[in-house]
């Protein structure tokens, strides 16, 4: 029996020297901290420094991460490095291998250390091999981001003498910083034991951010009574109140941000389930520029680097702010790595009671609108500045969130074909067809009231395929296209999408199939101002729902013989009456209900969602297949800091006198999954995600670079559920 791997004690994989950096997932938080500590040491060694003889920021980060450790290994490691801190000289970080210590405030501008240029020369000499090793190195901060964890900020700027006229002390063409980080959009598949695969999705984008239109928070009332005043237009209601903020949201919570169409095809064709493991993101190579216009005619715009302007960054790691996933509005980061993208302006809902009564005094009357306004008991006005730590970055700086580990249930990449009529043992047939291709074979051979089995029919002895008792309820019945009233207005009730209805018509949403509308950043081929966005309907394969357009329910005693009065059909729900009787429609989502999770929708669908802070929680969320059981990754907010002029007067106007400033920065992230390879259990081959010759050209650019991303199915492989 092996007790040690290198010098690692039992129960750990990374806590100790001499271990491999490829031992799989850490066993506990202390082991995870040790893994990041080892990776930082490896980075130091590659740069020519010996961290074993010095106390490094990586050691300090390990001390901070294990200060509350309850396991014996974490406690020993914590006090070991505290002792090292007391006796060992301090090792400074390099820009290529930044600190893993807690965030530090920017200080004065400093010259780059000489070893930067030595390392650059070494890299150039090492060639492609060194570049490959750099690409495989961890992000500049691998710090675990626990609930309430702090991100890491690195400030490393070079001295540059400005020769331009940029505002705010900006420089011209002088040195503006040292390049940091790498641009990586590869998806790495690592095949592990027992049929498991580790999928590491890397994503990078150039993000453009203008300064906000206003530095103020604004409460905006939206009221489109011109449309809802017309009878029958309740579904056009847009009335609400929102808080518009000066911040923007960097949202990577969409499948298209992380996977290209070829990657997704490989995943859905070869794997049966996905587990969401971890997420980290970083901002680096920050550039801030000012814009001025010359006095000549016609005026000429002049752009200058501003080395003293700031980019404000805030990570809501505790999720104290309203959770606003942008995929539901198609406003995440763009799906094309080679195209610059923009973050979405951040806003959130504000409480505002209002009642819409869709009744009329006459045939031409208008609905009754009752506006109650905001209840003083429900006011919640959030500002980032006093709720979340804000970091100030200047040209060349970077910001890393650390690693967030998910706690989510897995997501299946298969669909079920079994409904209640296909569960259990089929009836015994006394005779079988004797000729090939015979149809309408209906002879079971035993009289219906003489059969054996179990039913829940109290007034009849008939045992049929309709009356035999099944083990559970597959899917659930829900009102189709139903609107409900809330204190803030009507809303469409969400339902789980399922097979049924107009399944071949991708222009109609049948049985709750989600329908997506999106623009050029997210898959639309061409766009002009005011053009209708492109759309698609994701047709679910799951039998998780029923057939709401054709639902019927037997809700009265079963009598013999069955008469027309007791048969409920879609077109004749009650004998002699027309139209559906909604009092007979009910929801069977109860303790006997079997229901699958929603499918991942590539590329526009949301990946993870936040769990509701309620005592009774929904078992599913319609928007995303992964629901975080506890905390979820903190939202990342950015904002160009006010760059004021000497004419600023706080009493003169609500609008500040500002220098026009914008920022370009690079964003990169890493999203890790674990997947299970799909085993084949059937004789027959199955349908897989593929394309025909015509569809192939949808994924290719045309002669002016226009292209589109076509949505791909994610649950084509069938499976039985019982």
Swiss-Prot record:
GO molecular function, one term: structural molecule activity
InterPro entries, per database record: Capsid/spike_ssDNA_virus, Parvovirus_coat, Phospholipase_A2-like, VP1/VP2
Amino-acid biosynthesis is among the record's keywords: no
Region annotation Phospholipase A2-like: where it falls in the sequence: 14-59
UniProt keyword Phosphoprotein, yes or no: no
Domain comment in the entry: The N-terminus of VP1 is sequestered within the mature capsid. It contains a phospholipase A2-like region and putative nuclear localization signals.
Function of the molecule: Capsid protein self-assembles to form an icosahedral capsid with a T=1 symmetry, about 22 nm in diameter, and consisting of 60 copies of two size variants of the capsid proteins, VP1 and VP2, which differ by the presence of an N-terminal extension in the minor protein VP1. The capsid encapsulates the genomic ssDNA. Capsid proteins are responsible for the attachment to host cell receptors. This attachment induces virion internalization predominantly through clathrin-dependent endocytosis.
Family: Belongs to the parvoviridae capsid protein family.
Protein name: Capsid protein VP1
Organism: Mink enteritis virus (strain Abashiri)
Lineage: Viruses, Monodnaviria, Shotokuvirae, Cossaviricota, Quintoviricetes
